Amino acid sequence: MAERKIKRALISVSDKTGIIDFAKSLAEFGVEIFSTGGTLKKLIEAGIAAKSISEITKFPEIMDGRVKTLHPAIHGGLLAVRGNSDHEKQAAENNINFIDLVAVNLYPFEATVAKPDVTFADAIENIDIGGPSMLRSAAKNHKSVTVITDAADYQCVLEEMRANDGATTEATRLYLAKKVFALTARYDGAISNYLEKISQTDESVLPNHLSVSLTKEIDMRYGENPHQKAGFYAMKVGEQNLSFDEFFEKLHGKSLSYNNLLDISAAAGLIEEFRGAEPTVAIFKHTNPCGVAQADSLETAYRKAFSTDTQAPFGGIIAVNRPLDMATAKAINEIFTEIVIAPEFEEGVLEYLMKKKDRRLIRQLKALPSSALEFRSTVCGLLVQDKDAKTATKEELKVVTKRQPTEAELEDLLFAWKICKHVKSNTIVYAKDMQTVGVGAGQMSRVDSSRIARWKAGEVNLELKNSVVASDAFFPFADGLIAAAEAGASAVIQPGGSIRDEEVIAAADERNIAMVFTGTRHFRH
């Protein structure tokens, strides 16, 4: 039972890539081929002796092709257990011939609904019924039936047939059957997600049902710690199709670890805030920025970012918003950096940076999606939310103090605000002249975050006088604002919304500090 010779095949594909060569090869093995609609026409035009499925069903295709393979003669031929005397007797009594191979792919539902001008009628017509039914029947009976959904598998099936006198092995049939059930699950999920989306009346809430398809893209040696198993999975949910290879290309270095991918995601997310801006460099460690700067050149921006914290960048991650030039590469090379992310690398830079074999070099291929769903596992389920893609403009800022911020302060405030969104809460970011000069991350108390930011600035002798401060959430008391003023800050940006806002504003006015509210909180847990 391990090997099963293929005598009769059913081919019906919407993606006709490679189907002619595959069918010709099957014919060379003496396989009898049946087909439907456009596939049948294409096979006959290529000189292949294919027959209509109607010769099996003795029933014409009807209702614009909606009904053609949903027939006992088809599914009996697929589902009959070979070697089962009752099944074989019933098949003979009903003139049902066994079908040994099915090559089917489905109507392009996902591609159809992704079109901006798709109509509901078009979407419905691209819901495949007969295809999934045949695939599931064949996959259920994979001990006897070879089922192919992917043109990439044609060649391996043919090679196995050549090696086994026209037969396939049970191991291969099981492998192909697993692909079928993964495909049909994803296909049904895409239909469900689409129907949820178009019937949703309240856009402020997420759908009641959400189907997510995950496909392993990277095997990892371990997870966050060596005792944890891990892998990276590409994700398909609705129109959101996310995979590492879609957005990034690893050009050099060892395989990426679990922690590497977390850091790449964090660093790329922050540098995306500065797409199209002046040369900007972000240095990350453990998913937090330890230094960010913008300047006239990438090299200057890197050196300013590095000066924020001269210890944390060792073994860190660097992301830039411009093609990486040699001057910046040489500056980066002064210490060990584990990962460098850039949209491009200028001539000679890759070869220069590749001299350190343990360094990972990553090319970012395109912009990250501005709207996407984010998922977070908990001990009892999955949290889902929209991506925090909101930013602030000068026009949206509300000045709440007597003193207006200067133009230079406004630039620094907006710069710091973009950064604090990407720092673990509670977050305080000091910035001056488009450079972070102190970052306080992840503290339970906002005042403690401010103290850490001040202490870090002092460690590297960075001047906080006339700096600006960004806070990811409101100051619950005036003490956070007072701490910033005592450090030398001249302007503050924060969401506002505390019941003690007036106390905080009064404290700012007493110290001649300009303060603006954004009306948006940026917690990051």
From Swiss-Prot:
One cellular-component annotation, GO: cytosol
Superkingdom to which the source organism belongs: Bacteria
CDD domains: IMPCH
GO molecular function: IMP cyclohydrolase activity; phosphoribosylaminoimidazolecarboxamide formyltransferase activity
Record's comment describing the protein's domains: The IMP cyclohydrolase activity resides in the N-terminal region.
Membership in a protein family: Belongs to the PurH family.
Full protein name: Bifunctional purine biosynthesis protein PurH
Native organism: Chloroherpeton thalassium (strain ATCC 35110 / GB-78)
